[in-house]
Amino acid sequence: MVLATALGLRFDGGVVLAADRRVSYNGFILSKSARKVFLINERVGVSTAGLPGDFQELVDVLKYNITMYELENEKAATPTNVAKLLSILLYQGRFSGIYYAELVVGGIDNSGPKIFVLDPAGGLMEENFSAVGSGAQIATGILERFFKEGMSEKEAVELAERAMREAISRDALSGDGIDLLIITSKGSRMEFIPVRTA
């Protein structure tokens, strides 16, 4: 089981990525302030669940490779580029178990908003929404019930917050607040929502 909860969903004109801030291991809370949502470039981000050392290493390697790609090709990497590179990185480490992480990639390209979900072995799927981690079943239930095509940004942010709050309230491995990354054609912004947990 991958620790924590992370999710992403599309809306009309953008994407929302979210993750909790708790890091726990072997029954202990190690941190209540870990960032698990990352902006990769102006139009692509990643939300993560798993062991911090693993997803931080993945994000660092990803950012380096994306920067090199953008410099060599003189164009910004798309969400599809980022997701495929992450898939390769995860697949390369599948036998050694290097990366104990699940990720949601979200962003915008010329064809509109995109959400991709990746498992620890590099499996890659494009979805309208997805949740990963120990609270994924709870968050997915909320997303399946209330997601609709053509949602506004406000509706999508509210749905992401609701799904994360439900996961945090029922999953002991998730908690201590919600980081949100909203990406539209106008830019991106991060928000933090405090969540009181027992």
UniProtKB/Swiss-Prot annotation:
UniProt-annotated catalytic positions: 5 (nucleophile)
Catalytic activity: Cleavage of peptide bonds with very broad specificity
Transmembrane segments: none
Compartment(s) where it occurs, according to its Swiss-Prot or TrEMBL record: Cytoplasm
Regulation: The formation of the proteasomal ATPase PAN-20S proteasome complex, via the docking of the C-termini of PAN into the intersubunit pockets in the alpha-rings, triggers opening of the gate for substrate entry. Interconversion between the open-gate and close-gate conformations leads to a dynamic regulation of the 20S proteasome proteolysis activity.
Cystine connections: none
Broad enzyme group: hydrolase
Propeptide intervals in chain numbering: 1-4
GO molecular-function terms, A-Z: endopeptidase activity; threonine-type endopeptidase activity
Keywords assigned: Autocatalytic cleavage, Cytoplasm, Hydrolase, Protease, Proteasome, Threonine protease, Zymogen
Pfam family of the protein (one): Proteasome
InterPro entries attached to this UniProt entry: Ntn_hydrolases_N, Pept_T1A_Psome_bsu_arc, Pept_T1A_subB, Proteasome_bsu_CS, Proteasome_sua/b, Proteasome_suB-type
BP GO terms, sorted: proteasome-mediated ubiquitin-dependent protein catabolic process
Chief location of this protein within or outside the cell: cytoplasm
Keyword Cytoplasm found: yes
GO cellular component terms given for this protein: cytosol; proteasome core complex, beta-subunit complex
EC number: 3.4.25.1
Coiled coil ranges: none
Keyword Oxidoreductase among UniProt keywords: no
PANTHER family registered for this protein in UniProt: ATP-DEPENDENT PROTEASE SUBUNIT HSLV, METALLOPROTEASE TLDD
Subunit structure: The 20S proteasome core is composed of 14 alpha and 14 beta subunits that assemble into four stacked heptameric rings, resulting in a barrel-shaped structure. The two inner rings, each composed of seven catalytic beta subunits, are sandwiched by two outer rings, each composed of seven alpha subunits. The catalytic chamber with the active sites is on the inside of the barrel. Has a gated structure, the ends of the cylinder being occluded by the N-termini of the alpha-subunits. Is capped at one or both ends by the proteasome regulatory ATPase, PAN.
UniProt family annotation: Belongs to the peptidase T1B family.
Stated role: Component of the proteasome core, a large protease complex with broad specificity involved in protein degradation.
Entry protein name: Proteasome subunit beta 2
Species name: Korarchaeum cryptofilum (strain OPF8)
